[in-house]
Amino acid sequence: MKFDQKGLKKQSMTVAYFFDNINNDLDIKLRRLNEVDEQKRRITDRDLHRPGLALAGFTNLFTYKRVQILGNTEMRFLNHLDDKTRKMAFENIVKYKVPCIIITSNNKLDPALLDMATEAGIPAFITRNSSTRTIFLITDFLVDRFSVYQQYHGSMVDVYGVGVMLVGKSGLGKSEVALDLVERGHRLVADDAVVINRKGEKTLIASGNHVIGHFMEIRGLGVVDVKAAFGIRAIREKKVVQVVVELMEWNEDMDYERLGLDTKTTKILGVEVPLIQLPINPGKNITVIIEVVALNYLLKQYSGYVAAEALEERIKTSIDDEAMMTTRFGSNYLTKDYE
């Protein structure tokens, strides 16, 4: 299977969506300071901005399209100004189409300045959190929402804590294998439609389609609700993609990996991921093999142990030992008559 689909990316979100979801997902507790139409304001940038220079009058490089954070420094600067100068300083912000303003550490905003923001249609929020914590939480939220993503056909299972993604042609039994893994105590992340987000440069986070959730379709049986049938222990919402297992139809002309010395990889959204290709033929217990794939991954990651390399080293050592024994026997034979 080729993961060559171009990654997608959310282009923007409304401030209303931002406010509702960040309060649900994070312990940030934003409160509204004014009533404006938050649907008309859109956030298009995952970075935040502290407009200290803009308040001081330097707006040449003002990144006004970002969420603006007013912390202790900005608020104390405004508060030390007289009323007229304070309004002129705040005008340097509200004259631009700013998505929203967030005031941290429960600082009080001058009612006159709040009226200016309301008149300009700019939502203003306040939080008790410090600027550092607010920036950390909001940045993490925006990075997640604006990350590159794509949806793939397959199943995603947490096997011994290793994120294993099962892919392959339709009808090969990916869902059945995933169901068998769940029955053996592992956890289903997604089936049929796996949504993968790239977080940072090298981390792939898999989750399920929000409509399908943890339902599975098993040919001949129908729809299975994994959460209802196996309990909460059988599911999880997200998991890092660490290994891709491709189920393939058996082809006697194809050269399959037998030792495991050559590690194959595949690229998902530009990130290299180990790839294991498993041919399907009668008599193979695919579920157990996938468990061993996960265990081998853990051995390699945490102890650097690779079974194929260990066996290769033992064979080399055995050959060297036999060569030494042969040389020693030949030397003794010439000096002593064993017959």
From Swiss-Prot:
Enzyme Commission no: 2.7.11.-, 2.7.4.-
Residues reported to bind ATP: G168, K169, S170, G171, L172, G173, K174, S175
GO biological process, one term: regulation of carbohydrate metabolic process
Location of the region described as Important for the catalytic mechanism of both phosphorylation and dephosphorylation in the Swiss-Prot/TrEMBL record: 216-225
Reaction(s) this enzyme catalyzes, per UniProt: [HPr protein]-L-serine + ATP = [HPr protein]-O-phospho-L-serine + ADP + H(+); [HPr protein]-O-phospho-L-serine + phosphate + H(+) = [HPr protein]-L-serine + diphosphate
Annotated segments matching region Important for the catalytic mechanism of dephosphorylation: 279-284
Any one GO molecular-function label of the UniProt entry: protein serine/threonine kinase activity
Cofactor(s) the protein requires to work: Mg(2+)
Free-text function comment from the UniProt entry: Catalyzes the ATP- as well as the pyrophosphate-dependent phosphorylation of a specific serine residue in HPr, a phosphocarrier protein of the phosphoenolpyruvate-dependent sugar phosphotransferase system (PTS). HprK/P also catalyzes the pyrophosphate-producing, inorganic phosphate-dependent dephosphorylation (phosphorolysis) of seryl-phosphorylated HPr (P-Ser-HPr).
Record text about domains: The Walker A ATP-binding motif also binds Pi and PPi.
Name of the protein described by the UniProt record: HPr kinase/phosphorylase
